[in-house]
Structure formats: structure tokens, C-alpha cells
Amino acid sequence: MLRSIQHVEALSSRQISTTSMLLKNRAGKTKSTSNRTQLLTYEMAQKPHHIGVRKSWLTWHSQNLEEFRQSQPLVVAQDEVVRRFIRGFFPQNLVVSGNEIVIKRRGNVLIVAGFLQYSRRLDIRRIYWMFGFAEEFLSILLKQPVKLEMAFVESEEDVAYNYI
């Protein structure tokens, strides 16, 4: 009898919450720094619920078509392979630490878009060779055509939309 009374008292005290609400529902919101030094690109500045309106070019894909459907784990693995290869093959030229690499699928073609930082040491022949090698290597590795659509910028400040 004594045990059941203690059990009932414990349950009744658990139902009353005396803490204040924290309202931690801020998904997709980047934290601001004290002296506004964190770089924010246009895509990072948009809120997650705008992805279908303002960022629709990031969501165009053909995975919902019957002929081009692939399993989700395969797509995630392919995306990770492509991102790691681009980060490893262009280490000095990445902008915003490679977070702005966009991978689009159109039919069976994989399109990799993003920004690379221009360096004075890079000549045109080497750039064309690196792009051709990266496209060919990824095409052979993934067994589907891969196209690189990389744009060169002078510095990371050219890509910056805002500083927070």
C-alpha cells in the first residue's frame, strides 16, 4: 500500500512542469557572431521553407521519373563520393570550404556546380586538364555522364551575400 502511494505521488509530480519554454525551433537559422565575421552566401541566407520557391534550381531533379529512379542509399553514396573527390582534387581553389557544391541529376547525367577560387598560379591548360580529368574519372567511377559547371571567382568575398 505504501509503495502504491509513493508511486502515485511520483506520477503526479512528474506531470507538472515548472521550467520555462525555451522555444528552440530554429532549424536552418545560422548563428550570428559578435563582430559579423561569418560569411553567408545567398543559398545559406535563405530559410528552409523557401527551398521550393527561391531556391528551386537546387531542387530540380529527375529521380521521381520511373526510368531514372535510383535507390536513396546509392544516391547519397554517389553524392558523398563526388563531394569528397571535388574537395580533394581542388583543395586550394575551394570557396567556403566546399559547402557550396551543388549536385543535380537530370536524366542519367550528373551535373556538379559550384564556385572555385581563382589563383594566379593556375594556367588555362592546367584548368582544362583538371576539368576534363575530373569529369572523365567521375564518369568512369559512377558509370554515368558527369559534367562540371564550376565558376571561378577572385576571392570568397565575391561569393558573400552577407556577413553575420
Curated annotation (Swiss-Prot):
Component of the mitochondrial ribosome small subunit (28S) which comprises a 12S rRNA and about 30 distinct proteins. The lineage of its organism: Eukaryota, Metazoa, Ecdysozoa, Nematoda, Chromadorea. Keywords: Mitochondrion, Ribonucleoprotein, Ribosomal protein, Transit peptide. One of its GO terms (molecular function) is structural constituent of ribosome. The keyword Transit peptide applies. This is Small ribosomal subunit protein uS3m. InterPro entries: Ribosomal_uS3m. It comes from Caenorhabditis elegans. Belongs to the universal ribosomal protein uS3 family. The gene is mrps-24. It comes from the Eukaryota. GO terms for cellular component: mitochondrial small ribosomal subunit. It is found in: Mitochondrion. Residues 1-23 form a transit peptide. Pfam families: MRP-S24. One of its GO terms (biological process) is mitochondrial translation. PANTHER family: MITOCHONDRIAL 28S RIBOSOMAL PROTEIN S24, SMALL RIBOSOMAL SUBUNIT PROTEIN US3M. The keyword Ribosomal protein applies.
